[in-house]
Regions:
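C-terminal partner/receptor-binding element of secreted or periplasmic proteins
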Residues: 129-160
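Sec/Tat-exported extracytoplasmic proteins
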Residues: 43-47, 59, 103-106, 147-154, ...
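Second-shell loop/turn segments in exported
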Residues: 23-27, 82-86, 126-136, 140
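Short, internal acidic amphipathic alpha-helical interface segments
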Residues: 80-121
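Hydrophobic h-region of N-terminal signal peptides that target proteins for export
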Residues: 12-21
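N-terminal secretory signal peptides
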Residues: 22-75
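Extracytoplasmic/secreted envelope proteins and their assembly/folding machinery
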Residues: 33, 37, 96, 133, ...
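Bacterial N-terminal signal peptides that target proteins for export
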Residues: 1-9
């Protein structure tokens, strides 16, 4: 029995700091989630925490999410996922052209393929985590502008 306790004790000594760090990370993530949820609620949105721990909200019939990155609180990312399903290889090529066009034309946004769909997001660094409040409306406007550029290029290619 004694021979088993010693290795377990040593294992505990090495693992205890990892458990403490995980708890600190969850506290940081919860604090960031609360900050985003409180702000969005004040702005009239109805935010929820999604299964990944990100903050999801709807605006004008679209579902957005704010990526919660607890180990980099001054990184701010808001995403509109699944704006255009890719239904064929020909359409995939058109999407790549439209993504390139949108990325070249729209300020700050990134359009990209995720599996068989198009996502558009904003990624930026801010001095303090709370500073996202100062740029949120402009980010949403820019994000929607990126979507508009993507969709217009897709429609142009499809003859609409």
């Amino acid at each position: 029995m004694r021979s088993l306790l010693r290795p377990l004790g040593i294992l505990f000594l090495f693992c205890a700091p990892l458990f403490a760090a995980a708890q600190d990370t969850s506290k940081e993530k919860a604090a960031m989630q609360k900050m985003y949820v409180d702000f969005l609620t004040e702005e009239g949105y109805r935010p929820e925490i999604d299964s990944d721990g990100d903050v999801q909200f709807k605006a004008e019939g679209r579902t957005y999410f704010i990526n919660v990155v607890e180990d980099d609180p001054t990184y701010f990312r808001v995403v509109l996922a699944n704006i255009w399903p890719i239904e064929s290889e020909d359409e995939r090529v058109q999407c790549l052209v439209a993504v390139d066009y949108s990325n070249a034309k729209a300020k700050v946004t990134k359009s990209y393929l995720v599996k068989d769909n198009i996502w558009v997001g904003i990624e930026t660094f801010i001095p303090e985590a709370e500073d996202f409040k100062k740029i949120f409306k402009r980010c949403m406007s820019a994000l929607n502008n990126g979507v508009t550029h993507f969709v217009s290029k897709m429609k142009e290619q499809q003859g609409n």
